[in-house]
Amino acid sequence: MLPPAPAAHPNLSTREVGLMLQHTMRLCLITLVIGLTGCAAQGGANPPLERLDLPPGFDIEVFAEVPGARSLAVADGGRKVYVGTRERDLYAVLDGNRDGVADGVLHVATGLKVPNGLAATDGRLFVAEQHRIIRFEPDGKVDIVVPEGILPDFRHHGWRYAAVGPDGKLYVAIGAPCNICEISGFEGTIIRMNPDGHNLEIFARGVRNAVGFDWHPVTGEMFFTDNGGDNLGDLIPPDELNRAKEPGLHFGYPFVYGDGVPYPQFEGRAPPVETTAPVVAFEAHAAALGIHFYRGAMFPDDFRNDAFVTQHGSWNRTDPIGYRIMRVRFDDGLPASKEVFVDGWLGRDGRPWGRVVDVAELPDGSLLVSDDFAGLVYRITYADH
């Protein structure tokens, strides 16, 4: 069981959140040290992992139980993995000796507002909430990076994604506050800023709902997922993998999708600027979310610099699709093909028992995958048998 959380409120001050962080971390660390399990959130789940289909040599296991597990941020050399949610809670999975077996789960903070976007760097944790961006310092102090009143504050697509880029800047995806509609300001963009919040600017426009991005390890170019609009039929529009090779590009929304096909709501209206088409089209409504370029040495050599993309799964398609992890093979810095890597979270009866969200890599080269439906974080390993 998790420790009792302080009374939550969506508008807690940063000082109150900081005090909660320090109190909860102190309580949980004491509990772990004396050998109790009050902070562990493991052992209760019994997911049917045998239903999952992986390539030969690969294995998957439960790394930790985390309610509503969404975005992942690996910190402290893999000793901590922060886990965000779409509710009000923030967690951290501990693995002190980095053996790939979690020691416990800390309920780091509550009372946050959709703390989905996480980025860990230099001992600090950035949390992109729906309405602001804050930063946890190692001593528990909480600084405001972007205050309320600047970012759009809508629940629809209000779950941010965040990461620190090769340039040291913090990047945050801001979804459109609707299905298909007029947008303005920071809506439907990916923004970037200095770690202190200064020099805030729009990096990419025309982005409906990006919930994952990463930079190619060789070229340094950003690739991000984007979800196509709903209620246009089972087969359109495709989900996308986009290449942002430079700042200032427009990726079509809400005017066009895919290779320039107009959204019906904007038929006859040309985009204000030239748009950039996706480099990979996934099946419509598969809900492509997390993306990670493999950099490790555990997997076979031909996985290096390929991308893993999670598909959260459809919610209003006649025949459900997604609920799996895709592998996108890259050649010379560009996508060459795509294939299913792990499948089986969708049952034969058409009902899912898991919905994968984000993917991250531990220092040993194993992969972590979050599942907000099952409330789990999985670990995928490879052994040459």
Task: Show where each model-derived region lies.
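Surface loop/turn motifs at the tips and blade-to-blade linkers of beta-strand repeat domains
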Residues: 62-67, 106-111, 145-154, 202-206, ...
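Beta-strand-rich domains and repeat architectures in extracellular enzymes and scaffolds
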Residues: 61-86, 287-293, 309
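Acidic, glycine-anchored loop motifs typical of Ca2+
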Residues: 98-104, 140
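Hydrophobic core register within WD40 beta-propeller blades
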Residues: 72, 118, 162, 210-213, ...
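Asp-box/WD-like beta-propeller blade repeats and closely related beta-sheet repeat scaffolds
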Residues: 131-165, 173-176
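Beta-propeller domain segments
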Residues: 42-54, 159, 176-179, 193-198, ...
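Conserved beta-propeller blade signature
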Residues: 80-82, 124-127, 169-173, 221-225, ...
